[in-house]
UniProtKB/Swiss-Prot annotation:
Alphabetical UniProt keywords: Amino-acid biosynthesis, ATP-binding, Cytoplasm, Glycosyltransferase, Histidine biosynthesis, Magnesium, Metal-binding, Nucleotide-binding, Transferase
An annotated GO BP: L-histidine biosynthetic process
InterPro entries the UniProt entry points to: ATP-PRT_HisG_long, ATP_PRibTrfase_cat, ATP_PRibTrfase_CS, ATP_PRibTrfase_HisG, HisG_C, N-reg_PII-like_a/b, N-reg_PII/ATP_PRibTrfase_C
Pathway: Amino-acid biosynthesis; L-histidine biosynthesis; L-histidine from 5-phospho-alpha-D-ribose 1-diphosphate: step 1/9
Protein name: ATP phosphoribosyltransferase
Location (main, coarse): cytoplasm
Length: 286
C-alpha cells in the first residue's frame, strides 16, 4: 500500500486535498482525521504538519508527500522534488524597515530573523555574507520591532503583512516556491514495491494539472480555412478534424489554454468559424 503525506493545515492543506480528490483519491471529511485509507486505490494518506512532511519522506517512513518547495529545501533531508503542483505560490524574500536596506550585501554583520534557517544560511554562505541568523517559529515580521533582528527573511504571498509592520522587500528573491510532490532521494519506490503506485499517482496529478490549464474547443469551419484555424488551435499534438454533412465544411476539436479561450474564440469567429463551443476537461491522461 502506498503511504502518502498530506498537509493537515495551512495554505497547502485544502488545495492538496482538492487536487487529490480530482485525481480520483478518497479524502477525509473531518479535519480531525489524521489517517485516511483509500482501499479502492490501495493508498493510505497521513495528514501531517507541512514542515514535517519532508522529514518523514526523507527518512523513508512515508513513500511520497505534498509540501512546499521552501519546506523541502529548508529541511535538508534526503528527499527530492518529483512534480510541481501549481498551487500555493510564494516567494522567499528579504525585508527590512523602509529605507534601511537595498541589497543583500548590506546584511553583513546584521541579525536576520527567519523560520527557514537552513535555507537562509545556505543562501548567505553562497554569497559570502556573514550575518547572524535568528530562528523563529512564526510572526517573523514582529522581530524587528521587538529588537530581536535588523531584517528578516520570510515567505511572502501578498506582502500586506510586511507593509502593516512597516517593512519593505529588498534584494533578489531567495527562492520561488509552490506546492510539490516529493519522494525519498533515489528511492523510486523500488525498495518497498511502490514504484508503480507512485507512477500512477504522478500521472493522475499531471492529468489534473492539464485539465486545470486547458479547455476543449469545438467549432465548424470551411475546409479551405482549416490550416489557418489549426494555427490558432494547434492542440497538444494536432487538432481533430471530422467531416460534416456539408462537404465544404468540417468540424474541428482541439485543446486550448484556458486563459486564452476568449481571445481564440474571437479570432476563430473573425476567420469564419461558427458554432464555437468550449467544454471543461474533468480529467485526462497526456
Amino acid at each position: 500500500m502506498l503511504r502518502v503525506a498530506v498537509p493537515n493545515k495551512g495554505s497547502l492543506s485544502e488545495a492538496a486535498s482538492a487536487m487529490l480528490s480530482e485525481a480520483g483519491y478518497r479524502q477525509r471529511r473531518d479535519t480531525r482525521e489524521l489517517v485516511m485509507v483509500d482501499p479502492d486505490n490501495d493508498i493510505e494518506f497521513f495528514f501531517l504538519r507541512p514542515r514535517d512532511i519532508a522529514v518523514y519522506v526523507g527518512q523513508g517512513t512515508l513513500d511520497v508527500g505534498i509540501t512546499g518547495r521552501d519546506l523541502l529545501l529548508d529541511a535538508k533531508v534526503e528527499a527530492e522534488e518529483l512534480l510541481p503542483l501549481g498551487f500555493a505560490p510564494s516567494t522567499f524574500r528579504f525585508a527590512g524597515p523602509v529605507g534601511d536596506f537595498s541589497g543583500v550585501e548590506q546584511l553583513e554583520g546584521k541579525r536576520l530573523a527567519t523560520s527557514y534557517d537552513g535555507l537562509l544560511r545556505d543562501y548567505l554562505a553562497e554569497r559570502g555574507v556573514n550575518a547572524k541568523v535568528v530562528r523563529l517559529d512564526g510572526a517573523v515580521e514582529s522581530s524587528v520591532r521587538l529588537g530581536v533582528a535588523d531584517a528578516i527573511a520570510d515567505v511572502v504571498e501578498t506582502g500586506n503583512t510586511l507593509k502593516a509592520a512597516g517593512m519593505e522587500i529588498f534584494g533578489d528573491p531567495i527562492l520561488k516556491s509552490e506546492a510539490v510532490l516529493i519522494r525519498r532521494s533515489g528511492s523510486g519506490g523500488a525498495a518497498n514495491g511502490t514504484a508503480k503506485e507512485i507512477e500512477i499517482l504522478i500521472r493522475r496529478l499531471q492529468g489534473v494539472l492539464v485539465a486545470r490549464q486547458y479547455v476543449l474547443m469545438d467549432y465548424d469551419i470551411r475546409k479551405d480555412l482549416v490550416e489557418d484555424a489549426a494555427a490558432l488551435t494547434p492542440g497538444l499534438e494536432s487538432p481533430t478534424v471530422s467531416p460534416l454533412r456539408d462537404s465544404e465544411w468540417v468540424a474541428v476539436r482541439s485543446m486550448v489554454p484556458k486563459k486564452e479561450t476568449n481571445r481564440i474564440m474571437d479570432e476563430l469567429y473573425d476567420l469564419g468559424a461558427r458554432a464555437i463551443l468550449v467544454s471543461s476537461i474533468h480529467a485526462c491522461r497526456i
